[in-house]
Amino acid sequence: MKTGTWRVKTGFARMLKGGVVMDVTNVEQAQIAEDAGAVAVMVLEKVPADIRAAGGVARMCDPAKIEEIMDHVTIPVMAKCRIGHVAEAQVLEAIGVDMIDESEVLTPADEEHHINKWEFEVPFVCGARNLGEALRRIAEGAAMIRTKGEAGTGNVAEAVRHMRIIRREISELTRLDKEELYGKAKEYGVPFDLVAEVASLGRLPVVNFAAGGIATPADAALMMQLGADGIFVGSGIFKSDRPQEMAEAIVEATAYYDDPEVVAEVSKNLGDEVAMRGLEISEIPEEERMQLRGE
């Protein structure tokens, strides 16, 4: 089968369905993630909570660090590039990452344009707050969508809101006639065929993971119950006091999200003193909210 085709890209993304992708910053963390059952790791210089705290410009991770992690784990390795930064994406593809996240967690390089992801053989994942954003990213070639949430906060509320918005807007599409779907395609700025496909399927044509503020096993179970195909965990694991236990618990809760007894068991001894502290969304100034980057 030819590499880099839409079928291959989306097929790879579907292989991760039901799993947890964990943010890591070094080999030790990557090995913890792999041992805990993560389906992939996302390599960055700092986890989102530290990016938020440090301020300044957040860029692609050092390629040497990514390659080092690739040499030490057997699961897929992803990495983030800045929104619109084609050269960073080219570097990541050149070193052989398995997927690129064109991410609002990093400082956008282009305030008006995202990367044309069709020009790459490596699959991309992108964030979305609503159906319009999701469809625009898919039209650009994204093989996976994730909620934006509000990364680095340990607060799942925005991820919940974004997942509910996307589900509601998809449900509304399924009730529209052809002329109304043409109107929606124009409103969203995407091809009619893509809107019609979503209306017919009753879901996105790619997998839709939850991300942004997931900090506990119960958070992961909640997002799966809301229809997520899988989970991205950023700061929630390695900002906790017991990373290994938290990683294993979130993997278990994601797999058995519909079994409260399992979620309860893996959540034991992972209370506020263990989970990351978290931020209240309303206390974050609008200009510091990562989710507002890249509409």
Curated annotation (Swiss-Prot):
D-ribose 5-phosphate binds at D23, G152, G213, G234, S235. InterPro entries: Aldolase_TIM (IPR013785), PdxS/SNZ (IPR001852), PdxS/SNZ_N (IPR033755), RibuloseP-bd_barrel (IPR011060). Gene3D superfamilies: Aldolase class I (3.20.20.70). The active site is at K80. It comes from Methanopyrus kandleri (strain AV19 / DSM 6324 / JCM 9639 / NBRC 100938). It is an enzyme of class 4 (lyase). Its EC number is 4.3.3.6. Belongs to the PdxS/SNZ family. GO terms for molecular function: pyridoxal 5'-phosphate synthase (glutamine hydrolysing) activity. The gene is pdxS. Keywords: Lyase, Pyridoxal phosphate, Schiff base. This is Pyridoxal 5'-phosphate synthase subunit PdxS. It catalyses: aldehydo-D-ribose 5-phosphate + D-glyceraldehyde 3-phosphate + L-glutamine = pyridoxal 5'-phosphate + L-glutamate + phosphate + 3 H2O + H(+). It comes from the Archaea. NCBIfam families: PRK04180.1, pyridoxal 5'-phosphate synthase lyase subunit PdxS. D-glyceraldehyde 3-phosphate binds at R164. Pathway: Cofactor biosynthesis; pyridoxal 5'-phosphate biosynthesis. The keyword Lyase applies. Catalyzes the formation of pyridoxal 5'-phosphate from ribose 5-phosphate (RBP), glyceraldehyde 3-phosphate (G3P) and ammonia. The ammonia is provided by the PdxT subunit. Can also use ribulose 5-phosphate and dihydroxyacetone phosphate as substrates, resulting from enzyme-catalyzed isomerization of RBP and G3P, respectively. PANTHER family: PYRIDOXAL 5'-PHOSPHATE SYNTHASE SUBUNIT SNZ1-RELATED (PTHR31829:SF0). In the presence of PdxT, forms a dodecamer of heterodimers. One of its GO terms (biological process) is pyridoxal phosphate biosynthetic process.
